[in-house]
């Protein structure tokens, strides 16, 4: 829920718990994106952190965000983040660079997953994974949601299941 709220979703934790636990129905637009994110986290909890599964997680979490043909696919357009006033705050990797940057990202991720790391190193690299992913901004939308999921996924793979509760 908090990952969804960062993206501007209006749903609150109490409402989402009532929706998931007790089946209380809300207007579909109120819960769809958060439901998708919940499903992506559920998928991640039972899947290995790798390229194929990250792309699948994006397909799941972006079901109600981007068109089906863009889900889990690398973007081919320029990407930037702007303020509500329209001022550009950040320009992501150029479309011609995204594929290569993601190949490096997945290669480095694979190496980190194989390394014995201290707890401090795990937290450091989890934060770096998040940062590098959002700097590349590989998807048309859902980059922040994906980065937060990948960060938590990495923590859980390295520290165990309880890391999902952080």
Residue map of PLM features:
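FIC/Doc superfamily catalytic core
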Residues: 1-166
């Amino acid at each position: 829920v908090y990952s969804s709220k960062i993206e501007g979703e209006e749903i609150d934790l109490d409402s989402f718990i009532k929706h998931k636990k007790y089946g209380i129905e809300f207007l579909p637009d109120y819960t769809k994106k958060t439901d998708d994110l919940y499903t992506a986290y559920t998928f991640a909890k039972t899947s290995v952190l790798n390229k194929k599964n990250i792309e699948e997680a994006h397909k799941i979490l972006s079901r109600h965000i981007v068109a089906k043909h863009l889900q889990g696919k690398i973007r081919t357009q320029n990407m930037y983040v702007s303020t509500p006033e329209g001022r550009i705050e950040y320009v992501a990797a150029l479309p011609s660079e995204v594929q290569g940057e993601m190949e490096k990202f997945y290669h480095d991720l694979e190496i980190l997953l194989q390394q014995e790391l201290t707890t401090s190193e795990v937290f450091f690299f989890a934060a770096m994974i998040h940062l590098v992913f959002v700097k590349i901004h590989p998807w048309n939308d859902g980059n922040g949601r994906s980065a937060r999921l990948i960060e938590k996924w990495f923590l859980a793979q390295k520290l165990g299941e309880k890391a999902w509760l952080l």
